[in-house]
Regions:
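N-terminal segment of the mature folded domain
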Residues: 21-153, 157-160
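Periplasmic-binding protein-like
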Residues: 110-119, 196-199, 241-267, 271-275, 280-302
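Ligand-binding pocket segment of bilobal, Venus flytrap-like solute-binding proteins
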Residues: 181-249
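Acidic, polar low-complexity linker/tail segments
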Residues: 296-348, 352-363
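…and closely analogous acidic/polar surface helices at protein-protein or active-site interfaces
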Residues: 344, 349, 354-394, 424-430, ...
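Von Willebrand factor
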Residues: 402-404, 411-472, 509-519, 542
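VWA/integrin I-like adhesion module and closely mimicked acidic/polar interface patches used
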Residues: 479-535, 545-546
Length: 551
């Protein structure tokens, strides 16, 4: 009995212990901590370095992630604190750092590589101009370039100076060389005649180098015979085998503007990751990879010597002075848009079919039109707005094309000397108000005769081009639905092919939202020299900003 009394507690204890062990959950597996992305906002010309995402992660453990945007759009995002990035990587940061606001946003910066602006001239045209001899080419000046443009002998492609770094730096190069000043320029120093002469040769605009290269390949020898861009881009184009003939690279004697690709820290909290990435980018192995992969010049002389066979020895000329004066930069952009560039003439083809009433699409379209006729004074807003001397036709359509209405923005006052931002005249404000009122009155009903509307608009632009050949013509069409009235895409292709040759100089840009047939729209822009903008994931007013950079 005593034995039983002793055994029972022991058995209970053992059973309890066994039960406890059986009920215990196994320890959870050790969780692998998530690697935070190190977000970098880069300008679009840096898409060729995207393989660095994987390379940096393997070498440093930092999960690098690029997002890409236009120069001025990205600059504005940094200036306003809306970049949503830990770092920025631009071709240069001279505009960004030209005032205290930009300087306050950038915590650290490291120059990574170099590429000077060059003038690429088709070899046969270089011979005609007497520029083919290396000794002669070495003595050419920005004035020689501007004179050839003025005389119609140099017809070039260039990214929009108001939205892209390379376009802006080329224009600044002309201004700096014409001033003959060794020190920084002011807005009053700008030689207006030099700008006017240079821009007479500007025949192929666009927002980025990729689009311009595609168009240059198609139009080399007919519409254009030169391409002004970074040396690295022109060398890559020469090596592509896609050109009708190679480009001779000219580096004007007075000097050039050079992109130094600063890698800039925006978020102090990510300093450690930034330093790891910057150190990797400046390492000898990465500098060699960048030079060979992108044809940009290493920042280290000893590394540059190892790739000397890839890069023209003439490229690194005197650096033209860049003024930190924001008034000069803003005044130059404003004068380019409103005074010096070939004025814009465009037809906006507006889908007013019944489907546009739903999903807030009508409101979005109306707001977008009102936006370009509004008073947004931001950097990109100034670029997107209707400019002085601009001519605009608004062409609604539904079952059929109807109600074409024309607007013309008057010219502003012209400064006798230098450049400066100017307020809108009362006459301009009246025209902008008329455009906004037109948008307010749009009614949505009926079907979608998209290709009829685009075709009629091209005919209108052709007729206007015959009367006023000095404008930059384009058609911009907005639609949310598949074409279900009038011409099919095949009908359009047939009829387009029968139009006069001059129509090839009028690009058609399509804005896609809703259920529009993306395949057909891409087929249309492929033959008309434009591109498709997708507004299904981006606000339409933001798409408008992008479109304006191509006009």
């Amino acid at each position: 009995m005593k034995l039983l009394r002793w055994c029972l507690p022991l058995a209970v204890t053992l059973l309890a212990a066994c039960g406890k062990k059986a009920d215990e959950a196994p320890p959870p597996p050790t969780a692998t901590p998530a690697v935070r992305e190190f977000r970098v906002l880069a300008t679009t010309d840096l898409r060729d370095v995207q393989p660095l995402e994987e390379m940096v992660f393997k070498a440093t453990g930092v999960k690098l992630r690029f997002s890409f945007g236009g120069t001025m759009e990205s600059t504005e995002a940094v200036l306003t604190g809306q970049a949503k990035a830990d770092a920025a990587w631009f071709a240069n940061a001279k505009y960004l750092l030209s005032d205290a606001q930009g300087q306050g946003r950038v915590k650290l910066q490291e120059k990574i590589m170099l590429s000077p602006i060059a003038v690429g001239v088709s070899e046969s045209d270089a011979r005609k101009l007497g520029w083919a001899d290396p000794a002669t080419a070495a003595q050419l000046t920005w004035k020689d370039i501007a004179n050839a443009a003025r005389d119609g002998k140099l017809r070039y492609a260039l990214s929009n100076p108001a939205t892209s770094n390379q376009g802006f730096m080329a224009l600044m190069g002309v201004v700096a060389a014409a001033s003959r000043k060794a020190e920084a320029l002011t807005a009053a120093d700008v030689d207006r005649a030099a700008i006017a002469d240079f821009l007479k040769g500007y025949k192929l605009p666009g927002d980025n180098s990729t689009y311009l290269s595609e168009q240059f390949i198609l139009q080399q020898g007919t519409k254009v015979n030169a391409f002004i861009n970074y040396e690295s881009w022109l060398l890559s184009l020469n090596n592509s085998g896609k050109l009708r003939e190679k480009l001779l690279l000219i580096y004007p004697k007075e000097g050039v503007s050079t992109a130094d690709y600063p890698f800039m820290l925006l978020s102090e909290a990510q300093r450690d990751d930034y330093l790891k990435v910057a150190e990797y980018l400046k390492s000898d192995a990465t500098q060699l990879w960048l030079a060979r992969q992108t044809l940009r010049r290493p920042i280290k002389n000893e590394i540059a010597a190892q790739v000397a066979d890839l890069l023209p020895k003439e490229g690194m000329r005197v650096e033209l002075p860049f003024s930190p004066d924001r008034a000069l930069a803003d005044g130059l952009i404003g004068a380019y848009l409103n005074e010096f560039r070939a004025p814009i003439a465009s037809t906006f083809v507006l889908d007013t079919s019944g489907s546009m009433q739903g999903g807030g699409r009508r409101d979005q379209l109306v707001q977008a039109i009102q936006y370009i006729a509004g008073a947004d004074a931001s950097l990109t807003g100034r670029i997107a707005r209707l400019n002085n001397r601009e001519r605009l036709w608004l062409q609604p359509f539904s079952d059929a094309v109807y109600g074409l209405t024309a607007f013309e923005v008057p010219a502003g006052s012209t400064a006798a000397k230098g450049v400066q931002l100017q307020a809108d005249s009362e006459a301009k404000q009246q025209v902008l108000a008329q455009v906004r009122d037109f948008a307010d009155q749009l009614k949505m009903t009926g079907g979608t005769a998209l290709y009829d509307a685009v075709y009629v608009s091209l005919q209108n632009m052709l007729a206007e081009k015959k009367k006023n050949p000095n404008y930059q013509y384009s058609v911009v069409a907005f639609t949310d639905g598949e074409n279900n009235k009038g011409r099919t895409i095949e009908d359009f292709k047939r009829d387009y092919a029968a139009l006069p040759e001059d129509v090839r100089g009028i690009p058609v840009f399509m804005v896609l939202f809703g259920e529009a047939n993306e395949t057909d729209l891409k087929a249309l822009v492929q033959i008309t020299g434009g591109r498709v903008f997708d507004a299904r994931r981006t606000p339409l007013y933001s798409v408008f900003k992008d479109i304006r950079a191509y006009q």
